[in-house]
């Protein structure tokens, strides 16, 4: 049997129909504080684009630099390209992401893989004969 997703005991369908002020009470204090301080114009525009994409009006991929946007239930089922600092990475928004920031799903740094040290990198490598 497949487990149904619930956020704080509420199913996803109920979360979508819930008014925002009662939804905010379910979030942690950090997310609640961020949302009650107000949604900026850029965030409001992105939320509108996501709603249009869910309705089938938006044709272009949605790109954003807003990594501090909290995922709301009205955003689920849409792919958003989030900027990692170098490129836009696609993020498929699912119900498990509700209450988290978009930036949590796009890593901004990558693992460093060092190459072989060059000549003069250490004192002993000065005397290594060149090829």
From Swiss-Prot:
Keywords: Ribonucleoprotein, Ribosomal protein, RNA-binding, rRNA-binding. GO terms for biological process: ribosomal small subunit assembly; translation. It comes from the Archaea. The keyword Cytoplasm does not apply. One of its GO terms (molecular function) is structural constituent of ribosome. The keyword Lipid metabolism does not apply. One of its GO terms (cellular component) is cytosolic small ribosomal subunit. SUPFAM superfamilies: Ribosomal protein S19. Protein S19 forms a complex with S13 that binds strongly to the 16S ribosomal RNA. Belongs to the universal ribosomal protein uS19 family. This is Small ribosomal subunit protein uS19. The lineage of its organism: Archaea, Nitrososphaerota, Candidatus Cenarchaeales, Candidatus Cenarchaeaceae, Candidatus Cenarchaeum.
């Amino acid at each position: 049997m497949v487990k149904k997703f619930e956020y704080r005991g509420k199913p996803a369908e109920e979360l979508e129909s819930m008014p925002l002020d009662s939804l905010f009470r379910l979030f942690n204090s950090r997310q609640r504080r961020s949302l009650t301080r107000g949604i900026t114009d850029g965030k409001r525009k992105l939320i509108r684009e996501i709603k249009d994409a869910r309705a089938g009006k938006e044709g272009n991929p949605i790109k954003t630099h807003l990594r501090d946007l909290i995922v709301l239930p009205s955003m689920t089922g849409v792919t958003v390209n989030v900027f990692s600092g170098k490129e836009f990475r696609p993020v498929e928004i699912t119900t498990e992401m509700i209450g988290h920031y978009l930036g949590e799903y796009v890593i901004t740094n990558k693992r460093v893989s060092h190459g072989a040290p060059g000549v003069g990198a250490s004192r002993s490598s000065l005397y290594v004969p060149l090829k």
